[in-house]
């Protein structure tokens, strides 16, 4: 090997700032993994980094992990490899870190051969996708009746802090009818990862679940990669013909990690501090789920943290425009103790009409109309204008309030079949 070629393959860092390294490496690609050695005389690998951009003839890398122990004598060596993750049935019941490695097991499952797959895959072509025509039943009354999901749909769960996103996600895992569940906890607190693992240990579905995590203390690139890894694992089980449910909590923290990486790579902020590349990257992740003609499906649920109780956040607006529907959680309903705190009038499933029959559509429309009338009556009551006995139609609506609220509430331990849900909504609107 020539001396010049050797220099292009090894480099010292020009700058180390937090998780970001700048170097003079030239023969590398975006997404490539580089090993970091302690020094030129040592082969010990002390860290790894991922190429995230190029700027002013410099290559910018983001550390996988932290920068503790690195120095000017640190040597950066390209590997010509990209991040891969473990996949396979042996992953069921496992906890997976942002490197795609199993770190723990919460269920004893089949120890079959572990395979490796790239994490940043292209979405399926339109010609490979199957139409969404079959309902994905969640066991949650308000969703299955008013916001019916379809196999292969992508739904957003939008809420401000403290509205019960994790509560709803646990209900979806416990009561929905998927074959495999892949849960990605992105940028969450370490306590929440511990609580989720403990929850899964006691779940009847633990042997069909995979948990991928990157807590808030992990580097930005780790948090991004954890979302890719969770999706790649779901894709593997889809190719095996399974009906997969994918949960990413939260998509907002994934987007913030993208923002941090992009800003560190020298991009300029645009919409609300987010560089343009963040909005380019979102569809590449969100378009990967779906139902395939070859068999198998990924039905995905993404939690989105709102800054307040509306959709003014540009990130939330962008995500809502990409997904196939959204479930809006209301702080007011949560404060009243109504769980799941779903605001049915602000929520929508864009495949609803494709997966339910005419009778179901009529009943759902009647319930929404009743719910809207109740909201109007609440305003009249708040102004002190309602007097029982003066208006028969208002009295009829008033007498329905407790029945409607009872339907919208649900104990997290209870799941309802489709038949039970439709019977209950029929009784409510009768």
From Swiss-Prot:
Question: What are the coiled-coil residue ranges?
Answer: none
Substituting residue 272 to A results in: Abolishes oligomerization. Exhibits ATPase activity levels similar to the wild-type monomeric form. Shows severely attenuated levels of both invasion and hemolysis. Low levels of secreted IpaC
Enzyme Commission identifier(s): 7.4.2.8
The effect of residue 350 to A is: Lack of ATPase activity. Mutant is unable to form external MxiH/SctF needles and to restore the invasion phenotype in a knockout strain
Q: What is the effect of changing residue 311 to A?
A: Slight decrease in ATPase activity
Q: Which reaction does it catalyse?
A: ATP + H2O + cellular proteinSide 1 = ADP + phosphate + cellular proteinSide 2
Which compartment or compartments is the protein found in? Answer: Cytoplasm
Q: Which GO terms describe its molecular function?
A: ATP binding; ATP hydrolysis activity; identical protein binding; protein-exporting ATPase activity; proton-transporting ATP synthase activity, rotational mechanism
Consequence the record notes for mutating residue 287 to A: Reduces oligomerization. Lack of ATPase activity. Exhibits moderate invasion and hemolysis levels. Low levels of secreted IpaC
Instruction: Answer whether the UniProt record assigns the keyword Manganese to this protein.
Output: no
The alphabetical list of record keywords is: ATP-binding, Cytoplasm, Nucleotide-binding, Plasmid, Protein transport, Translocase, Transport, Virulence
Q: What class of enzyme is it?
A: translocase
Q: What is the effect of changing residue 267 to A/R?
A: Does not affect oligomerization. Exhibits ATPase activity levels similar to the monomeric form. Shows at or near wild-type levels of hemolysis and invasion. Increased IpaC secretion
One Pfam family per UniProt: T3SS_ATPase_C
Q: What's the superkingdom here?
A: Bacteria
Substitution effect: residue 307 to A: Slight decrease in ATPase activity
Please provide the Gene Ontology terms (biological process) for this protein: protein secretion by the type III secretion system
Kindly list the GO CC terms recorded for this protein: cytoplasm; type III protein secretion system complex
Q: Which InterPro entries does this entry report, sorted A to Z? A: AAA+_ATPase (IPR003593), ATPase_a/bsu_AS (IPR020003), ATPase_alpha/beta_chains (IPR050053), ATPase_F1/V1/A1_a/bsu_N (IPR004100), ATPase_F1/V1/A1_a/bsu_nucl-bd (IPR000194), ATPase_T3SS_FliI/YscN (IPR005714), P-loop_NTPase (IPR027417), T3SS_ATPase_C (IPR040627)
Instruction: State the Gene3D superfamilies in the record.
Output: 3.40.50.12240
Gene null: resulting phenotype = Mutant is defective for assembly of the needle and secretion of the translocon proteins IpaB/SctE and IpaC/SctB. Amount of the needle filament protein MxiH/SctF is greatly reduced. T3SS effector protein secretion is reduced in Shigella strains coexpressing wild-type and inactive Spa47/SctN.
Fill in the subunit field for this protein: The core secretion machinery of the T3SS is composed of approximately 20 different proteins, including cytoplasmic components, a base, an export apparatus and a needle. This subunit is part of the cytosolic complex. Forms homohexamers. Interacts directly with MxiN/SctL (stator protein) and Spa13/SctO (stalk protein). Can form a soluble complex with Spa33/SctQ, MxiN/SctL and MxiK/SctK.
| NCBIfam families for the chain | fliI_yscN, PRK08149.1
Role:
ATPase component of the type III secretion system (T3SS), also called injectisome, which is used to inject bacterial effector proteins into eukaryotic host cells. Acts as a molecular motor to provide the energy that is required for the export of proteins. Required for type III secretion apparatus (T3SA) formation, proper protein secretion, host cell invasion and virulence. May play a critical role in T3SS substrate recognition, disassembly of the effector/chaperone complex and unfolding of the effector in an ATP-dependent manner prior to secretion.
Protein's name in the database: Type 3 secretion system ATPase
Q: What is the lineage of its organism?
A: Bacteria, Pseudomonadati, Pseudomonadota, Gammaproteobacteria, Enterobacterales
């Amino acid at each position: 090997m020539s001396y010049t070629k050797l220099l292009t393959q090894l480099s010292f860092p020009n700058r180390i700032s937090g998780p970001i390294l700048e170097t003079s490496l030239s023969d590398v690609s975006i997404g490539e993994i580089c090993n970091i050695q302690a020094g030129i005389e040592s082969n010990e690998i002390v860290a790894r980094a991922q190429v995230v951009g190029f700027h002013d003839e410099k290559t910018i890398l983001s550390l996988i992990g932290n920068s503790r122990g690195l120095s000017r004598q640190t040597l950066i060596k390209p590997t010509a490899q990209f991040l891969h993750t473990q996949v396979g049935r042996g992953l069921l019941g496992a906890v997976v870190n942002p490197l795609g490695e199993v770190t723990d097991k919460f269920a004893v499952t089949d120890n079959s051969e572990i395979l490796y797959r790239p994490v940043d895959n292209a979405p399926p072509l339109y010609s490979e996708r199957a139409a969404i025509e079959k309902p994905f039943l969640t066991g949650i009354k308000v969703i299955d009746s008013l916001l019916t999901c379809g196999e292969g749909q992508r739904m957003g769960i939008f809420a401000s802090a403290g509205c019960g996103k994790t509560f709803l996600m646990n209900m979806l895992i416990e009561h929905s009818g998927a074959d495999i569940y892949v849960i990605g906890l992105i940028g969450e607190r370490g306590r929440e990862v511990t609580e989720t693992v403990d929850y899964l240990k006691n779940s009847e579905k633990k042997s069909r679940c995979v948990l991928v995590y990157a807590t808030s203390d992990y580097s930005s690139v780790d948090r991004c990669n954890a979302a890719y890894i969770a999706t790649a694992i779901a894709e593997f089980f889809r190719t095996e013909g399974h009906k997969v449910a994918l949960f990413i909590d939260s998509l907002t923290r994934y987007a913030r990690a993208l923002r941090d990486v992009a800003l560190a790579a020298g991009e300029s902020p645009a919409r609300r501090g987010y560089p343009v590349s963040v909005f380019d990257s979102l569809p590449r992740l969100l378009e990967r789920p779906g139902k395939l003609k070859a068999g198998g499906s990924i039905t995905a649920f993404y939690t989105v943290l709102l800054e307040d109780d509306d959709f003014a956040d540009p990130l939330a607006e962008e995500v809502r425009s990409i997904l196939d529907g959204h479930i809006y959680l209301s702080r007011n309903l949560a404060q009243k103790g109504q769980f799941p705190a779903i605001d049915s009038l602000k929520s929508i499933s864009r495949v609803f009409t494709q997966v339910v029959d005419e009778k179901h559509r009529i009943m759902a429309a009647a319930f929404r109309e009743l719910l809207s009338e109740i909201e109007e009556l609440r305003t009249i009551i708040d102004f002190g204008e309602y007097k029982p006995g003066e208006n028969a139609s208002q009295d009829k609506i008033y007498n329905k309030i407790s029945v409607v609220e009872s339907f919208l509430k649900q104990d997290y331990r209870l799941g309802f079949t489709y038949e039970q849900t439709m019977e209950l909504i029929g009784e409510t609107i009768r």
